[in-house]
UniProtKB/Swiss-Prot annotation:
The modification Alanine amide is found at A28. The synthetic peptide has antimicrobial activity against the Gram-positive bacteria B.amyloliquefacies S499 (MIC=0.05 mM), L.monocytogenes 2231 and S.aureus ATCC 29213, against the Gram-negative bacteria P.putida BTP1, P.aeruginosa PaO1 and E.coli ATCC 10536, and against the fungi S.cerevisiae, R.mucilaginosa and C.cucumerinum. It is not active against the fungi F.oxysporum and B.cinerea. The keyword Disulfide bond does not apply. It is found in: Secreted. GO terms for biological process: defense response to bacterium; defense response to fungus; killing of cells of another organism. Its main location: secreted. This is M-poneritoxin-Da4b. Expressed by the venom gland.
C-alpha cells in the first residue's frame, strides 16, 4: 500500500523536497 511505498522512498523524497526548498529560498 501507500505506507509501504512511502517507507521505501521517503528518504529520497525528503532529500528532493529539501533541495527544492533550498532552490526556492535562493530564487526568492
Amino acid at each position: 500500500g501507500l505506507k509501504d511505498w512511502w517507507n521505501k522512498h521517503k528518504d529520497k523524497i525528503i532529500d528532493v523536497v529539501k533541495e527544492m526548498g533550498k532552490a526556492g529560498l535562493q530564487a526568492a
